[in-house]
């Protein structure tokens, strides 16, 4: 039995439709369609089949289509011709729920450029070129401005957060990393440790998943590992004299220093508690093994890398470069230096990139062209959405909280976009 979508004198295709999202499955039969069928018509077909089978989601969902792992953006027959795929064989076409468009929610105005941003739960932490940190609610209320650094803040990361207390860290061009303790109810903050050891500005920071260590990369080309313990050198109950010393010095040295890059380390991420990955202006991405205190492997590019993001969902690395492009790498591959995909869409330097923490296919990027773009890594030729709002360069982006896509820029603002949950991801 075959269902037909046909027209006069048009080429025909035999189509097998399938999906990995079982709640949207249609009858497993061949479909005879005309070659120039559009995505809109395929959507009508699938929703009609869902309705006929009594599926309650029929008509509520739009779908995208993949052939051999690549999105089909043009009429199907044209897609086949461009890729020299035979019309004689049955076409195996996968369909997936189209991701809902993020909605602009808020604009958080600061006094200077916003160069770092990270969300956790209902709170947003930002770092600025006026040397301050700021804490906001995800509803747009400003809670606290935090002075302390004496040069622009280039990176921030949450260590822990509950209803009573938050701990976070900041990295600055003043060559220091500061560890902060925030009393949530009193809305007061204290710098509990100043991490010293870098000899030039610190450009990036990240905490491991167990939140026991943090890593920093600097213009001094060094990667340093630090304890995130708010207590002095792990003392559980310091004596009065030790407390006085802590109050006056609050200085911490690195647990480990790793050399290997030749230029600025622009991005750092933890793969696991013993493995890190860094990007650098020296055209390399390096994977580090802390047990060996050295480099495990490296990826060599042809341009500087300005940032990178590692996905714990798919094990892939996405990297940003000054040539306007983003590149996808598989660090597990024996051909790790070969680019799996190049993503075209930005018109100026790409400064920041972050994977979704809940969807293995999606990531966001921010660039000097004032744009934030949302990508599906299966669609390299164009982003699936452009998040409009910034009036100047985008310096940082974040998707730590799955509900919000955040971006900071040289227009002194953080843009907050509400990230909708696809029907297929809802519990």
UniProtKB/Swiss-Prot annotation:
GO terms for cellular component: nucleoplasm; PeBoW complex; preribosome, large subunit precursor. Coiled coil: none annotated. Pfam families: NLE, WD40. Keywords: Nucleus, Repeat, Ribosome biogenesis, rRNA processing, WD repeat. The keyword Signal does not apply. Residues 13-97 are annotated as: Ubiquitin-like (UBL) domain. GO terms for biological process: maturation of 5.8S rRNA from tricistronic rRNA transcript (SSU-rRNA, 5.8S rRNA, LSU-rRNA); maturation of LSU-rRNA from tricistronic rRNA transcript (SSU-rRNA, 5.8S rRNA, LSU-rRNA). InterPro entries: G-protein_beta_WD-40_rep, NLE, WD40/YVTN_repeat-like_dom_sf, WD40_repeat_CS, WD40_repeat_dom_sf, WD40_rpt, WDR12/Ytm1. Required for maturation of ribosomal RNAs and formation of the large ribosomal subunit. This is Ribosome biogenesis protein WDR12 homolog.
